[in-house]
């Protein structure tokens, strides 16, 4: 699996220290093991997890600004855990409403020694944080409107950002953004061996 990860990283132009590579593989191994009982992801093949979960998450890293992030609707820790592994200088709160997912996240935290994550079981609308976050990250929401309405209280004003991971560029959604939200950028992400498009939408309060 290390060989596969190395080849994907090379194609993506990403260089990581060995410790981070081993943590990423350790995460895939835990996800594969727990998935059989907990049904955490529809991706069953660990080699595919490297593409669709690991690379798909860490390509976002260069575009994140700040040091305190929350991954909303993180599920089994995506994109939060891969990002936390490659950004040990930043802190990631991993929010999910399902207890079995949060139990898995705590196990990952323990086994991989990740001191920069905090798994939290909560519904997003009931969760508050002081101080607020530099960035709100999610690939879980069906629409940008849902993300903005559920998470409006989480980023610091005015400099905090929303980072939405989407497939095809959501032009219909971008055309109807609320008046108090400004589109900062739409970034086409290149994920090696991934079928379909990936875009990162970065939004700010104005």
From Swiss-Prot:
Q: Which reaction does it catalyse?
A: guanosine(527) in 16S rRNA + S-adenosyl-L-methionine = N(7)-methylguanosine(527) in 16S rRNA + S-adenosyl-L-homocysteine
Alphabetized UniProt keyword annotations: Cytoplasm, Methyltransferase, rRNA processing, S-adenosyl-L-methionine, Transferase
One Gene Ontology cellular component = cytosol
InterPro entries on file: rRNA_ssu_MeTfrase_G, SAM-dependent_MTases_sf
* Cell compartment(s), UniProt: Cytoplasm
Positions contributing to S-adenosyl-L-methionine binding: 73, 78, 124-125, 139
Stored SUPFAM superfamilies? S-adenosyl-L-methionine-dependent methyltransferases
Its EC number is 2.1.1.170
Q: Which GO terms describe its molecular function?
A: rRNA (guanine-N7-)-methyltransferase activity
Q: Which CDD domains match?
A: AdoMet_MTases
Name the domain of life this protein comes from: Bacteria
* Family, per entry: Belongs to the methyltransferase superfamily. RNA methyltransferase RsmG family.
Query: NCBIfam families in the record, alphabetically?
Result: rsmG_gidB
What does this chain do?
A: Specifically methylates the N7 position of guanine in position 527 of 16S rRNA.
Q: Could you identify this protein by its name?
A: Ribosomal RNA small subunit methyltransferase G
| Species of origin | Yersinia pestis
